Amino acid sequence: YCCHPACGKNFDC
């Protein structure tokens, strides 16, 4: 998963 703003649409915490 991606837990930081730079992930954009992939943000998933």
Swiss-Prot record:
Q: List the disulfide bonds.
A: 2-7, 3-13
- The answer to whether the entry has keyword Secreted is yes
UniProt name for this protein:
Alpha-conotoxin SIA
Q: What is the annotated tissue distribution of the protein whose record heads this document?
A: Expressed by the venom duct.
Stored InterPro entries: Conotoxin_a-typ_CS
Q: What does this protein do?
A: Alpha-conotoxins act on postsynaptic membranes, they bind to the nicotinic acetylcholine receptors (nAChR) and thus inhibit them. This toxin blocks muscular nAChR alpha-1/gamma subunits.
User: Which UniProt keywords are listed?
Assistant: Acetylcholine receptor inhibiting toxin, Amidation, Disulfide bond, Ion channel impairing toxin, Neurotoxin, Postsynaptic neurotoxin, Secreted, Toxin
Q: A Gene Ontology MF term for this entry?
A: acetylcholine receptor inhibitor activity
Q: Which residues carry this modification: Cysteine amide?
A: 13
Q: What is the top-level taxon of the source organism?
A: Eukaryota
Q: Which organism is it from?
A: Conus striatus (Striated cone)
